[in-house]
């Protein structure tokens, strides 16, 4: 889930 960290920081935010 490293890509989610740069976008929002939460895996749930990745949609």
From Swiss-Prot:
Its cofactor is Cu(2+). It comes from the Bacteria. Signal peptide: none annotated. One of its GO terms (molecular function) is metal ion binding. Keywords: Copper, Electron transport, Membrane, Metal-binding, Thylakoid, Transport. It is a peripheral membrane protein. It is found in: Cellular thylakoid membrane. One of its GO terms (cellular component) is plasma membrane-derived thylakoid membrane. Belongs to the plastocyanin family. Participates in electron transfer between P700 and the cytochrome b6-f complex in photosystem I. This is Plastocyanin. The lineage of its organism: Bacteria, Bacillati, Cyanobacteriota, Cyanophyceae, Oscillatoriophycideae.
């Amino acid at each position: 889930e490293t890509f989610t960290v740069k976008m929002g920081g939460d895996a749930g935010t990745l949609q």
